[in-house]
């Protein structure tokens, strides 16, 4: 059971900035760890894949920013929309940008393939949060 889960998405790109790749993930505020993550486009389908990974965790309170798809997907659940309550996951986004150069907005480092992009970021999350 997770009492408070923060959800957010982070932008990255593969090859060119026009080829966007999004990391969607959920962060347990109390345990200070990533619970689940998925990669894809910034669509309801990608958010749905993340929600299906989170369904066994029985999250009590969802905390997100103001992206409209969160509101429509979390309808009927205890959902708080606030920048104040998403500070931890936003800080984690900054840490990811500092540790992984390919997530930097203005960087010479970038991924050349979708598979490599997902594997590098997924491996980092695996080492830092899942083991």
Curated annotation (Swiss-Prot):
GO terms for biological process: DNA transposition. One of its GO terms (molecular function) is DNA binding. InterPro entries: Transposase_27, Transposase_27_IS1. Keywords: DNA recombination, Transposable element, Transposition. Belongs to the transposase 27 family. Absolutely required for transposition of IS1. This is Insertion element IS1 protein InsB. The lineage of its organism: Bacteria, Pseudomonadati, Pseudomonadota, Gammaproteobacteria, Enterobacterales.
